[in-house]
Regions:
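Compact, glycine/acidic-enriched structural inserts
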Residues: 138-167
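A surface-exposed partner-binding patch
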Residues: 1-120, 164-168
Length: 168
């Protein structure tokens, strides 16, 4: 269960709140029907090699609140340029093995969350709610929950690269 009030109007910093509202989000947004449809689609998919997705509450909650949103930060970013992203787990539908491999390395279940920059990187969430970015250069830790990950992407905070021992 989340330790914050998802209807609170002061949940995000001003710049993040503005980017979220620009994308169509508002405090209390909750589309469980869409989240359940995504969950069903992921559960039903089996790769040619037999790999399947796992679905868990942290993912469904993130999809229910932020699913379908195209979120873009403005400004120069704190460390790097803000990263536009889309919350839609079906961007990772055909990456069941990749997501499962990350989960094995982390010792937890992981499933797709969305994508950065029109497919430049896959966003994934684990069973504890932690969020990651997977791209051609490696795997990155974006935050301890969806809120922190959104802040990281919208404000241009440099993410931590995952290594064999965890984030650097």
């Amino acid at each position: 269960m989340r330790a914050f009030d998802r209807t609170a109007t002061d949940r995000f910093p001003v710049a993040v709140d503005a980017a979220l509202r620009e994308s169509g989000w508002q405090p209390g947004r909750w589309d469980i029907k869409a989240a359940e449809n995504w969950a069903d689609a992921l559960r039903a998919h089996v790769s040619p090699a037999g790999h399947r997705h796992t679905v868990f509450p942290a993912a469904v909650e993130a999809w229910a609140e932020f699913g379908g949103l195209h979120i873009t930060g403005s400004g120069p970013g704190r460390h790097i340029a803000p990263t536009p992203f889309h919350i839609d787990p079906l961007h990772g539908l055909h990456l069941a093995r990749t997501v499962a491999d990350l989960g094995r390395a982390l010792g937890t279940e992981v499933c797709p969350l969305g994508q950065e920059l029109d497919g430049q990187a896959l966003l994934a969430i684990d069973a504890h709610g932690r969020v990651y970015s997977l791209d051609h250069t490696g795997d990155w830790y974006l935050g301890s929950d969806i809120d922190h990950a959104i802040r990281t992407l919208v404000t241009g905070v440099r993410p931590s690269r995952l290594s064999a021992t965890g984030p650097l």
